[in-house]
Amino acid sequence: MEKYLINPNQRIATISKDIYGHFSEHLGRCIYDGIFVGKDSKIPNVNGMRTDVVTALKDMGIPVLRWPGGCFADEYHWTDGIGELKDRKKMINTHWGGVVEDNSFGTHEYFELIRQLGCDAYVNGNVGSGSVREMNEWVEYMTFDGVSPMADLRKKNGADKPWKLRYFSVGNESWGCGGHMNGDYYADEFRRYNTYVRDYTAGEHIYRVACGPNAFDFKWTEQVMRKVPGQADGLSLHYYTVPYNWDHKGSATEFNLKDYDRTVAKAYRMEELVRRHTEIMNALDPQKRVDLIVDEWGTWFDVEPGTNPGFLYQLNTMRDAMVAALTLNIFNKHADRVQMANIAQTVNVLQAVILTEGDKMVLTPTYHVFKMYKDHQQNTLIGSYLTNSNTVECEECSAPQMIESASVDENGTIYATVTNISATKKAKIKCQIADTKVSTLRAEILTGDMHDKNDFSNPDAVQVRPFDGVRKLSDGFVAELPPCSVVKFVINEK
């Protein structure tokens, strides 16, 4: 039996709600069909936004939504997406499927979506093919509440008042699709562009994100972090869980135990990535002025047969749920540096939380993990430690069988989320909570065979259910977690 220790007296950091953020790019059917169907659609909508999707995302507790990319961001010119629909310029989405982008979803539509969701805005600016002036004028258009050419243009297009822009990223993947730059060059470009990302509203600082590394590119982090503290508020990190390699990633649904173990073990490398990049940031920014922003993460498998390869459509199983659960626990544990994270992507793309097909909608296992974990948002991370006698391994790496995190809310309620990522082994734990006499304990579980999924023929196969494999103790609990499971424990003291 493994020992699980929780110490509510050890208050570490606030778990930012934005760790549970999402990302929607102009890619495949994420925006179009997935979220935006237009006002004239027969699918129920409010101002073009699918009512079912908006409701589901609100129920899940979506705190922030990144847009318009991704690689798309560095070929997106915002003025093409404003004004009358009939006058908007069409373009070819060269990164994603070579389809025509009609720009019917632009800045105004994005902020209407943000309004309906009740979440914060995270806009990604164009450094790769844009200009300083273009970026400056976009920020002015979105946020200035005075008399100026851009503010007047916004009013002409129907928005009398500016919007609140919480986050703004200066470029995306500038080491790759955003310009193939090196770290030193990008850092100088960031400083130049960032100068003109102005705070137009008193008391409303726009949080600036600098382009950070791709996965294990520690040199990039060092180069950029030598130049951006005092200028940037955050540094991005991108890491995708690819079971094999980019030419042969593996199927999203047809996989064996070896494939499963490789996936969850490689997902756990996020712990190493966050730790090592944070070490560099701590050395160059000991005041912690710059946060870590993991604004692209998740599983990336081969696309579903018969779909456009550029649309990145993949189904979602309990394996994906395990990746989501263990990763969110890692982010929670590093809440002192990780301010925001954005899973890729919200609807119909990669590790989506929602799938749509016509007027039908499916909530994926990943969706249910996010909804389970939403109680952690804005809680205080507390000290916790779980022993692990077993590991899940692949040739390159390994992961502990269980990954956990614990938090406490302002009322003293403790939330502990524990993931058993083994597909074959159950796990017994005995939890002791320091200086706590347990009054009530409730728990819920998401579990199933590693292949279990929700699809349009069986949308409710994977569901969160009450967990009866737990027994309350005076100072904690004893529980037995089945294979491939995530459990949330909610503890109140006397």
Located regions from the model:
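Histidine-centered catalytic micro-motifs
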Residues: 237
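Beta-strand-rich domain onsets/edges
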Residues: 265-266
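Non-catalytic accessory regions flanking glycosidase/transglycosidase catalytic cores in CAZymes
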Residues: 1-234, 270-303, 307-494
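Active-site His/acidic residue clusters
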Residues: 240-261, 307
